[in-house]
Amino acid sequence: MFVLDDLFVNPFLSLVDILQTMALDELYDTSEIRDQIKENQLLYEIGDRPADEYERRKQELEAQLRTAEQIRDQMRDRMEIKN
């Protein structure tokens, strides 16, 4: 019975774990969020974004970045993350 578990169940569970880690890594990509913060700043500086919208978006993105960094720190304990 244990041999069958080793042959059929364990590879499936490993694959699910790898897919979950990859999905979380993409979902919480800090470089993408940082790029959005830079884009928001640039649009504000060239006058394409009003100050109130800039501040609102900046706060949203900074909150997303904090969350993403926390999640990535937790993931780092599980598996090495390549940047």
Curated annotation (Swiss-Prot):
Gene Ontology CC entries for this record: gas vesicle
Organism from which the protein derives: Halobacterium salinarum (strain ATCC 700922 / JCM 11081 / NRC-1) (Halobacterium halobium)
Coiled-coil intervals: none
Location in the cell: Gas vesicle
Protein family membership: Belongs to the gas vesicle GvpG family.
The name this protein goes by in its record: Gas vesicle protein G2
InterPro entries the UniProt entry points to: Gas_vesic_GvpG_halobact, GvpG
Organism placement in taxonomy: Archaea, Methanobacteriati, Methanobacteriota, Stenosarchaea group, Halobacteria
Subunit-structure text: GvpF to GvpM interact with each other in vitro, and may form multi-subunit complex(es).
NCBIfam families: gas_vesic_GvpG
Function: Proteins GvpF to GvpM might be involved in nucleating gas vesicle formation. A minor component of the gas vesicle. Gas vesicles are hollow, gas filled proteinaceous nanostructures found in several microbial planktonic microorganisms. They allow positioning of halobacteria at the optimal depth for growth in the poorly aerated, shallow brine pools of their habitat.
UniProt keyword list: Gas vesicle, Plasmid
Lyase keyword on record: no
Miscellaneous remark of the record: Encoded in a 14-gene locus called c-vac which produces cylindrical gas vesicles only in the stationary growth phase.
Induction of synthesis: In PHH4 (a deletion of the p-vac locus) transcribed in all growth phases, maximal expression in mid-stationary phase. An unstable 6kb transcript able to cover gvpD-gvpE-gvpF-gvpG-gvpH-gvpI-gvpJ-gvpK-gvpL-gvpM is detected, as well as smaller transcripts. Gas vesicles appear earlier when grown in static culture, possibly due to O(2)-limitation.
